């Protein structure tokens, strides 16, 4: 059943599944929105100064302006702007939230959580979904456990391959992989 959970990113607007009409659309390797968000994140983490935070917010706002939604400002809120506190942690939260929305379904969330060292918090425990076999709306909207995940701290790093270890006797395996 159609439920609104399918993402149509990277699918041509001319594609019509009901009529078995699929249009070609070239793959996207790296989007401008991702570049803007990467740059904004790097700026914010680089230096805790107002001018740097303003520049970071400027790049987040470019994405929001393109989408036609309100932008962020350290000034007053109005019809076009949302006031935010002028500090590094607030801007960090904004950038991370914007990444989650803008890059939804593009396969970057896992690496984001690893880079931010938040994977253990976010990826451990029961994962829930909707009851897909529900025959009506009431049955469908029942949170249903579908997976129990375990995120081991070792997953923050990849192990060094044994062939590389064999080439250099001074090379030591990373923590958790010994």
Task: Name the predicted role of every residue range.
Residues 1-178:
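Acidic/polar-rich alpha-helix caps and helix-coil junctions
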């Amino acid at each position: 059943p159609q439920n609104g959970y399918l993402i149509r990113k990277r699918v041509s607007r001319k594609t019509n599944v009901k009529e078995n009409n699929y249009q070609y659309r070239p793959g996207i390797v790296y989007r401008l929105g991702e570049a803007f968000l990467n740059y904004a994140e790097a700026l914010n983490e680089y230096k805790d100064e107002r001018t740097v935070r303003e520049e970071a917010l400027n790049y987040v706002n470019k994405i929001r302006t393109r989408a036609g939604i309100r932008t962020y400002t350290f000034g007053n809120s109005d019809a076009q702007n949302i006031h935010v506190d002028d500090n590094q942690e607030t801007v960090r939260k904004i950038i991370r939230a914007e990444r989650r929305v803008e890059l939804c379904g593009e396969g970057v969330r896992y690496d984001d959580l690893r880079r931010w060292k938040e994977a253990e918090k976010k990826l451990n425990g029961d994962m829930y979904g909707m009851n897909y076999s529900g025959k009506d709306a009431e049955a469908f909207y029942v949170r249903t456990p579908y997976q129990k995940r375990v995120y081991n701290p070792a997953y923050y790093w990849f192990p060094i391959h044994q062939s590389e270890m064999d080439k250099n006797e001074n090379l030591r395996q990373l923590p958790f992989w010994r």
